[in-house]
Amino acid sequence: MKFIIKLFPEITIKSQSVRLRFIKILTGNIRNVLKNYDETLAVVRHWDHIEVRAKDENQRPAIRDALTRIPGIHHILEVEDVPFTSLHDIFEQTLPLWREALEGKTFCVRVKRRGKHEFTSIEVERYVGGGLNQHIETARVKLTDPDVTVNLEIENDRLLLVKGRYEGIGGFPIGTQEDVLSLISGGFDSGVSSYMLMRRGCRVHYCFFNLGGAAHEIGVRQVAHYLWNRFGSSHRVRFVAINFEPVVGEILEKVDDGQMGVVLKRMMVRAASKVAERYGVQALVTGEALGQVSSQTLTNLRLIDNVSDTLILRPLISHDKEHIIDLAREIGTEDFARTMPEYCGVISKSPTVKAVKAKIEAEEEHFDFSILDKVVEEASNIDIREIAQQTEETVVEVETVTGFGANDAILDIRSIDEQEDKPLKVEGVEVVSLPFYKLSTKFGDLDQSKTWLLWCERGVMSRLQALYLREQGFSNVKVYRP
């Protein structure tokens, strides 16, 4: 099989040296991503495209799908590479491949040609198009906005019959820009902002501030791993987790209620900047959007930025929530985000939207900064590939069931609001309500002689919580997916 990789247009307008560097990096990224699919795979770079050749036909769909998710690729062409001897030979090889697709449709032929030939590209289009029109009675030529476009590429004495065109995600190859550290919470915004920086050519590392216990961290780890595995697996990245509960406790005790949100964000930026400096990362990435919450006004954002010299990138600054959710749905993080607990929003009951620098600094004078230094020093740092290994090892231990036995009970772990809106009723089995955010403290109070089948609407949070309970030593948990 053969694929022709077309470059993102912004790469093609770079200077010769920069363009060659980008193409070289993209070629390496493709090799890194595809090496597990086919050991015989070959990746060859050219000035205006990259070729991927592989022998294992069973891997064709997987290779094609992986290529569409590598930053720097505008689109890929799945081609059949055959020799040709004449214009008529080109037509004869094109007819059987396209006959079925053209029946009852309007079409045109488009040819791209490289090398020296006795004919022009337009002459090939006319000859092949005329032949197809004659031999397929129900087909009709239409040069403007046809139903089907027959794409052919000719390179010296080889004919590339284009069997399919698949759009890539565009952007720059990862590694062409410097590393960044994304402050990831697992919600809609941080996942999308991380993706946008990967698409722009940055290797994205992840920093997670844990405010809600082990279950929250498990969920965020899986979001980070999903993003890396889907769009950035050509490079090794770090996942740094900082236990921020002591910092939150100090803020709740020492800081005025209205200033808590801004002070918390300032502490996060301070901590993330220390992590970035430790690993030589050039910038921080956040999912903040202007005016979305109280801490994201211009005044408050300026005060948050003031605590660090590290550049803070906010790719979503002008996006509205609906658009962000649409992007999350497009890249596949929507389900994760919908079931991710949000802890930051409950820290302050009456937050200020226009903080005063002197007042913020006065409040921070009460804060014990040794606590911040300690949590940064004790931060865990793992290779993101280890998350997959840990998850695979753990997932095997959590059984998913579609029915229930005599000693089983269903545990509805949705939030109270969701349960009131759509109560769960299952005949023949006891249904108990215990929201996910109470599992860590209340699950032990349940009847441990029963097997508890955790249930939520999408199955994401129930699986994460089952993993967490298993880690805590509870073996009587399964995931219920009818």
Swiss-Prot record:
Active site: C456
UniProt xrefs under CDD domains: PPase_ThiI, THUMP_ThiI
An example molecular function term from Gene Ontology annotations: CCA tRNA nucleotidyltransferase activity
InterPro entries recorded: Rhodanese-like_dom, Rhodanese-like_dom_sf, Rossmann-like_a/b/a_fold, ThiI_AANH, ThiI_fer, ThiI_N, THII_Thiazole_biosynth_dom, THUMP_dom
Disulfide bridges in this chain: C344-C456
Pfam families attached to this UniProt entry: ThiI, ThiI_fer, THUMP
Enzyme Commission code(s) on record: 2.8.1.4
Chemical reaction(s) catalysed: [ThiI sulfur-carrier protein]-S-sulfanyl-L-cysteine + a uridine in tRNA + 2 reduced [2Fe-2S]-[ferredoxin] + ATP + H(+) = [ThiI sulfur-carrier protein]-L-cysteine + a 4-thiouridine in tRNA + 2 oxidized [2Fe-2S]-[ferredoxin] + AMP + diphosphate; [ThiS sulfur-carrier protein]-C-terminal Gly-Gly-AMP + S-sulfanyl-L-cysteinyl-[cysteine desulfurase] + AH2 = [ThiS sulfur-carrier protein]-C-terminal-Gly-aminoethanethioate + L-cysteinyl-[cysteine desulfurase] + A + AMP + 2 H(+)
Localization, UniProt: Cytoplasm
Record-annotated THUMP domain positions: 61-165
UniProt keywords, alphabetically: ATP-binding, Cytoplasm, Disulfide bond, Nucleotide-binding, Redox-active center, RNA-binding, Thiamine biosynthesis, Transferase, tRNA-binding
Coiled-coil regions, chain positions: none
Chain ranges of the Rhodanese domain: 404-482
UniProt GO BP: thiamine biosynthetic process; thiamine diphosphate biosynthetic process; thiazole biosynthetic process; tRNA 4-thiouridine biosynthesis
Pathway: Cofactor biosynthesis; thiamine diphosphate biosynthesis
Top-level taxon of origin: Bacteria
Entry binding sites for ATP: L183, I184, K265, G287, Q296
GO cellular component, one term: cytosol
Stored PANTHER family: TRNA SULFURTRANSFERASE
UniProt cross-references to HAMAP family, sorted A to Z: ThiI
Function: Catalyzes the ATP-dependent transfer of a sulfur to tRNA to produce 4-thiouridine in position 8 of tRNAs, which functions as a near-UV photosensor. Also catalyzes the transfer of sulfur to the sulfur carrier protein ThiS, forming ThiS-thiocarboxylate. This is a step in the synthesis of thiazole, in the thiamine biosynthesis pathway. The sulfur is donated as persulfide by IscS.
Similarity section: Belongs to the ThiI family.
Name of the protein: tRNA sulfurtransferase
Organism: Klebsiella pneumoniae subsp. pneumoniae (strain ATCC 700721 / MGH 78578)
UniProt lineage: Bacteria, Pseudomonadati, Pseudomonadota, Gammaproteobacteria, Enterobacterales
Gene that encodes the chain: thiI
